[in-house]
């Protein structure tokens, strides 16, 4: 006789639920999005790579509609390989339908950046090379002509007269002590890669800075970027050029001109947005043919030029501005008709004098008058 036995299956023990990653494990990070080879990194400490940077996969960049230069606030978990959630982009929680900088219409600068302060330097610039929102300007400077002082005066004037503008100072290949001086003397964003850092850092810093400026401009902000210097940025790209391409005089690789040209060309006044003003220094009379060629390449791309004179600086005449060689294209858009007529009359009067005599006369008269308006009235009465 066969006895059938049935074995009752024991119910499988329920697998304990996986521990849920609670919000207690989330960390909030904030920084600028830098995209390299389709992979993004949130730079949490400035513009250069750091140990606490957060990796953002390309899929998440597309998912959230992020762009290089965005200031992102997000949550993440260690080991910082992806984001958990994006909370805001450039201070906004509604960023997906924003306009694209490349699709916006550039127009001539129409709104003037008033630079006049107690400083004679800013008053001279305001008279002879007026700057508008969206200007693309070159500050052409030989060594020891006072370009750093000019930049500091420009930064101080913009901060004081236009606190609504977002000021960015980009220093490429500068001395560390000058970076410190700039950070302590201005109220604005300072992004710096000192001369002892590799060329790759110089170019990465500049690229992220201009993308940051574009994101602000397309959002309706007025941005002013002071770059020191366009020449050193061009040198860095030239050193990183792969070689084998067309080489210009002075050992300048033709391919190395495109990235700094793209940086400088980003300056524009946007019809339906904000504006991006770029004032960049260009070094001349350095004894390097490469520097001269870099300047010649950018000479015709700007719409404003302020030229400094080594001869005037050697005589301790500051600001060492070459008045005849400095000026702004389409300045009549920025100036009212009477002011435009008086500045032309002033130019003709000073143009008949030697450069040293003209600058001394101008600066003396400016110090005697409380404002440029009062000075121009004096010009009207005496010429």
UniProtKB/Swiss-Prot annotation:
Keywords associated with the record: ATP-binding, Helicase, Hydrolase, Nucleotide-binding, RNA-binding, Transcription, Transcription regulation, Transcription termination
EC class of the enzyme, as a word: hydrolase
InterPro entries in UniProt: AAA+_ATPase, ATPase_F1/V1/A1_a/bsu_nucl-bd, NA-bd_OB-fold, P-loop_NTPase, Rho_factor_ATP-bd, Rho_RNA-bd, Term_rho
S-adenosyl-L-methionine among keywords: no
EC annotation from Swiss-Prot or TrEMBL: 3.6.4.-
PROSITE patterns cross-referenced by the UniProt entry: RHO_RNA_BD
Basic residues compositional bias, start-end: 8-17
Domain Rho RNA-BD positions: 26-93
Annotated spans, Disordered: 1-22
Domain of life (superkingdom): Bacteria
Entry keyword Transcription: yes
Residues engaged in binding ATP: 132-137, 144-149, 175
GO process terms (BP): DNA-templated transcription termination
Reported function: Facilitates transcription termination by a mechanism that involves Rho binding to the nascent RNA, activation of Rho's RNA-dependent ATPase activity, and release of the mRNA from the DNA template.
Family label: Belongs to the Rho family.
Protein name, UniProt field: Transcription termination factor Rho
Organism: Streptosporangium roseum (strain ATCC 12428 / DSM 43021 / JCM 3005 / KCTC 9067 / NCIMB 10171 / NRRL 2505 / NI 9100)
């Amino acid at each position: 006789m066969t006895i059938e036995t049935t074995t009752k299956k024991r119910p499988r023990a329920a697998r304990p639920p996986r521990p849920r990653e609670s919000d207690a494990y989330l960390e909030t990070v904030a920084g600028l999005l830098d995209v390299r080879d389709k992979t993004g990194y949130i730079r949490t400490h400035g513009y250069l790579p750091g140990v606490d940077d957060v990796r953002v996969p390309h899929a998440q960049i597309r998912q959230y509609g992020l762009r290089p230069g965005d200031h992102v606030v997000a949550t993440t978990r260690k080991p910082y390989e992806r984001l958990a959630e994006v909370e805001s982009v450039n201070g906004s929680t509604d960023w997906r339908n924003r306009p694209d900088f490349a699709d916006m219409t550039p127009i001539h600068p129409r709104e003037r950046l008033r630079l006049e302060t107690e400083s004679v330097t800013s008053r001279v610039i305001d008279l002879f090379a007026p700057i508008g929102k969206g200007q693309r300007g070159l500050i052409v400077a030989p060594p020891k002509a006072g370009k750093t002082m000019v930049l500091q005066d420009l930064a101080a004037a913009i901060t004081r007269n236009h606190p609504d503008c977002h000021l960015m100072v980009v220093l490429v290949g500068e001395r560390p002590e000058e970076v410190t001086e700039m950070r302590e003397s201005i109220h604005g964003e300072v992004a710096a890669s000192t001369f002892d850092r590799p060329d790759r850092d110089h170019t990465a810093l500049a690229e992220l800075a201009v993308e940051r400026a574009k994101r602000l401009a397309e959002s309706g902000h007025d941005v002013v970027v002071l770059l020191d210097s366009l020449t050193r940025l061009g040198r860095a790209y030239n050193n990183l050029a792969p070689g084998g391409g067309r080489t210009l005089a002075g050992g300048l690789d033709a391919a190395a001109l495109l990235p700094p040209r793209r940086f400088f060309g980003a300056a524009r006044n946007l019809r339906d947005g904000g504006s991006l003003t770029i004032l960049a220094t260009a070094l001349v009379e350095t004894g390097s043919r490469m520097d001269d060629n870099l300047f010649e390449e950018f000479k015709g791309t700007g719409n404003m030029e302020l030229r400094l004179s080594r001869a005037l600086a050697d005589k301790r005449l500051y600001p060492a501005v070459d008045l005849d060689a400095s000026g702004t294209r389409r300045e009549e858009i920025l100036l009212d008709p009477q002011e435009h007529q008086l500045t032309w009359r002033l130019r003709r009067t000073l143009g008949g004098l030697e450069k040293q005599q003209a600058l001394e006369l101008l600066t003396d008269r400016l110090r005697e008058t409380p404002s440029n308006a009062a000075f121009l009235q004096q010009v009207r009465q005496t010429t």
